[in-house]
């Protein structure tokens, strides 16, 4: 038994060896081109550089098997493919994320990869991976990003964004354009920028701060926080509370609802709006005077604040509603 244990231990220790593959390619292009990256596993990072006139690609892959020959065979059977067609650069790498365990928690089979691309600012990107995160920064052009196994991060993008992940959170910072983001496995965090925003998650909370433009957001798995939004707001959660700090003057309609918590709104004392606040699971209170329309009830408050204005609708089935002065 001791001999068997020792052999198993030594076998597990030998798994630590791995074979690495490094590739660097450069393609001459002009602004206004397209980048396409389709990989079976690994993270993708795209960075736009001012004044750049080429696309530079760095590839790092690491394959772990029980022996070197299997690792080298995998790399040979799954090459990285580069194609340039005019002003379009395409990178493809077949293969799937592969993890399996041996005794003592050591990796028996493992595939890792990281793809880094530097390109001109004015470039459109289409990125897809089944096994890692995607990050894009400083691009002036449309961004399409899809991953099944990691988060998404967009920074300083000037153009439309379509981002989807089944396995992580999404962060958007200082981006301007028509933004559509969706995740089944994490939260959404947006700060700065403007345009239009549509965001949905089944697995976390949503925080939107200092965005200039209309937003429509929804989550089944967390709370919602919105602060300093210049534009219409529509947000719903089935799994948490809602917190909002509203800009003054309020210039657009606001609709916030939850099935799983309270709603807490802060607004300046001189803000003018039409309030419609209703709850099935608590009370409604307001620090600001409300000229009531209809009957006064503990669970429903409807009327005008400071002579009225855009609609502020607050509805919850699972908590109280509080409107507070900033």
Q: Which residue ranges define each predicted feature?
A:
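Intrinsically disordered, low-complexity terminal regions
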Residues: 1-326
